[in-house]
Amino acid sequence: MKPYLLEHEELKELSAKIGGWRIMTNHIEREFNFSNFVEAFSFMTKIALICEKHNHHPNWENVYSKVIIKLSTHDLGGITNLDQTIASEINDIFEK
């Protein structure tokens, strides 16, 4: 998939497509909470595999049972269709 920057109208519609994610100036972000560190780290491991598949990696942090993920496409300087795709796949993992 060749990434392209999302246009203003696409960004406005993005929240409905990837529930739970906040649209920021140059990235999207979401906080995920789990009951313990093992669950949080397991979630991160699953995400790592998706990101490797797309060769697109998040900025993220993990503090005990909380994971915060930020997605953007640095090469293009903003939010792209690839960020949207990965956010959607992350949501699917979280909801399972």
From Swiss-Prot:
Its EC number is 4.2.1.96. InterPro entries: PCD_sf, Pterin_deHydtase. Transmembrane segments: none annotated. It holds the Pfam family Pterin_4a. It is an enzyme of class 4 (lyase). Keywords: Lyase. GO terms for biological process: tetrahydrobiopterin biosynthetic process. Signal peptide: none annotated. It catalyses: (4aS,6R)-4a-hydroxy-L-erythro-5,6,7,8-tetrahydrobiopterin = (6R)-L-erythro-6,7-dihydrobiopterin + H2O. One of its GO terms (molecular function) is 4-alpha-hydroxytetrahydrobiopterin dehydratase activity. HAMAP family: Pterin_4_alpha. Belongs to the pterin-4-alpha-carbinolamine dehydratase family. This is Putative pterin-4-alpha-carbinolamine dehydratase.
